């Protein structure tokens, strides 16, 4: 994966996913700030105290780099899966959902989907696909 990543040049990122990830990172840090801030602590001070970002722009720059790296990884995983006919079944997604449900005290896959919506199928499916691709890469590297 690292060799592929280092030799890849991404020209564009899927705008809808990119924008959604940036928005989610911002929303999550703002929610965290509201929950854990000290009295009279500004958002900028919270970012510095908790994460070491000197400015909000510095956090935004990190968010952009993180999102680009995540999407690059995702695109590489999809390409490797496609080229090697690695697939994910609905049973794989349900099993992963049940694992996550147990980990986070839900009654099962259906509870997670009910709480977070059908987009969880995409998240769970990608998680399974990522694991299968990494297992595939390990298997071919061991054979060399």
Stretch-by-stretch model annotation:
Residues 1-144:
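Extended, charged alpha-helical "arm"/coiled-coil substrate-binding scaffolds
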């Amino acid at each position: 994966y690292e060799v592929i990543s280092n030799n890849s040049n991404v020209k564009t990122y899927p705008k809808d996913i990119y924008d959604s990830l940036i928005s989610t990172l911002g929303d999550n840090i703002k929610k965290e700030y509201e929950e854990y801030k000290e009295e009279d602590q500004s958002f900028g001070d919270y970012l510095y105290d908790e994460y070491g970002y000197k400015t909000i722009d510095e956090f935004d720059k990190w968010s952009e780099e993180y999102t680009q790296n995540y999407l690059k990884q995702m695109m590489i995983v999809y390409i490797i899966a496609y080229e090697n006919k690695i697939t994910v079944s609905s049973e794989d997604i349900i099993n992963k959902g049940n694992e996550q449900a147990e980990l986070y005290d839900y009654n099962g896959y259906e509870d997670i989907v009910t709480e977070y919506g059908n987009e969880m199928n995409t998240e769970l499916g990608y998680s399974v696909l990522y694991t299968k691709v990494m297992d595939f890469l390990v298997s071919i590297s061991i054979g060399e």
